Amino acid sequence: MPNIKSAKRRVKISERNRLINKAYKTRMKNSIKKVLLALSEGKTKEEVEQLYKIAQSAIDKAAKIGAVHKNEAARRKSRLMSKINKHFAIE
C-alpha cells in the first residue's frame, strides 16, 4: 500500500491504464479468433479478407496506444495473413 501521495495517484492511473490495455487486447484477440473461425468454417476469401481488415485495425490500434509492442503487432498480422494465404492456396 503506497504511503506517498504521488504513489497513491500512480496506483489509480496504472489501474485505469491496465483496464484500457485489457480492453484493447481483448478486442484484438477476439477479432483474430473471428478470422480463424471463418477459415475453419470455410467462408469465402472475400469474407475472410473483410474480417482480416477489422483484425488488422484492432491490432494496429492496440500497438498505437502501447497495449502491445509494435513488433508483436507486426508478428500477429504476419502470422494471421500467412494462415489465410496457406488456407486459400490449398483450395
From Swiss-Prot:
Function as written in the Swiss-Prot or TrEMBL entry: Binds directly to 16S ribosomal RNA.
Q: Which GO terms describe its cellular component?
A: cytosol; small ribosomal subunit
Q: Which GO terms describe its molecular function?
A: small ribosomal subunit rRNA binding; structural constituent of ribosome
Please give the name of this protein: Small ribosomal subunit protein bS20
**From what organism does this protein derive?**
Thermosipho melanesiensis (strain DSM 12029 / CIP 104789 / BI429)
Which keywords fit this entry according to its UniProt record? Ribonucleoprotein, Ribosomal protein, RNA-binding, rRNA-binding
Q: Which family does it belong to?
A: Belongs to the bacterial ribosomal protein bS20 family.
A Pfam family found in this protein is Ribosomal_S20p
